[in-house]
Amino acid sequence: MRLLELKFENFKSFKGHVTVPLGPGFTCITGPNGSGKSNITDAILFILGSRSTKLLRARKLKQLIHGFQEGSKKKSGPKSCKVSMSFDNSDRFLAIEKDLVTFTKGIKLKGKDTTTYYQIDKKKSSAREFEALFSRAGLYATGYNIIQQGDVIQTSLMSGTERRRKIEDVAGITAYDNRLKSTRSTRKSVEADLVLLNERAKESKRTLK
């Protein structure tokens, strides 16, 4: 699986429609301060499902819309933004039977609030479906696929136990353990329901006699 391109529409510093192609051998993005390099990382985190606006360097989701200013009476500015990520999925790393897969996530202003929408290949999707597909592929907004500023120093200051947890996260062990706990919890609930149903069945038989 390889990231082929990113498309922006009024996302943070990217006004209008902007496409960033990521061809074979593409290794870095350079530019002066304030040119939008970090906003590319923010866009990837946004698509991957970051629920923390702090991680996206914004106080509110609406601040991801280009030119948005809280309390501004200006009515001509953008009322929405979106980001699309296209992947080469010829190796079927993503659990979708397509060679090219595009994920789109957007925000729309609705009065003083915002609504968020999700699409896979222009078809309506959900946050849960995004999360499920990305987690199976080992991609997490809060994982270690993306190393942000300060992460290296933070890792060097971790205890042995904290480093082990980090390695388990990268290896997918934590996600597996969470699913295992959820499955066990569901099984216990089902077993409790079966016991209750058996008791009711016995009570019904006694009543019929």
Regions found by a protein language model. Give the residues of each.
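Gly/Lys-enriched N-terminal cap/neck module of very large, oligomeric protein machines
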Residues: 2-209
